[in-house]
Amino acid sequence: GVATSADNYSQYWNPAKYAFASNNKGIGLSYTPYLSKLVDDIFLGNILFFKKIDDRSSWATGLRYFSLGEIQFNEFIAGSIVDQGIQRPSELTLDLSYALKLSSEFSMSVAGRFIYSDLKVAVDADTSSASSLGIDISAFYQSEIFKLKSNSALVRSGINISNIGPRLNYESGAQKSFIPTNMRVGAGLDIFFDDDNVLGFYTEFSKLLVPTPTAVFDSEQNLLGYKQPD
């Protein structure tokens, strides 16, 4: 989460947390299959690495790859279904972040992201893959440990505005697509019972910061689809 304790995967939630990491470095690997009961080739893969530069700062990098698997395209021509081939659409991001403690309890981070989206249909000459750049700006607060009745406790909070950047252009002359600019805000409390047992209470809110598509109707008020605002 955006406000939970730092871990190897903080790059995708709140890179500012790395400044409070207890380890000097770490690596994360994950593989998440999608719709595994229906298909076996849709998945999300991640690899991450972070390293603390000193007690106040750290850097991290990450690679994320999403595969939509093999998709068979067909076209209905003159009453017959014509095979248009198999496509393997995918998306990839490459991140780099830097986090710095501005005080003993507060840190901020900035991250840069290269985005590559290959969702084109090969038989359509007007479409192509698209790329863009995104920036994340995040902050993290972690209080000093204090007494809460008979136990120790601390408070954490965080905010991350991610994917600030230009839109993707899949087709020349067509409307561009927004990248998913998003804001996460969260806070929580950790209660320590002993060295091995911690109880945490956290809440988080997320808001997509791009325009909502508007419905398009014909003259008889039949829904034709949705249009993305400029």
Where are these regions (language model features)?
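Subset of outer-membrane beta-barrel
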Residues: 1-230
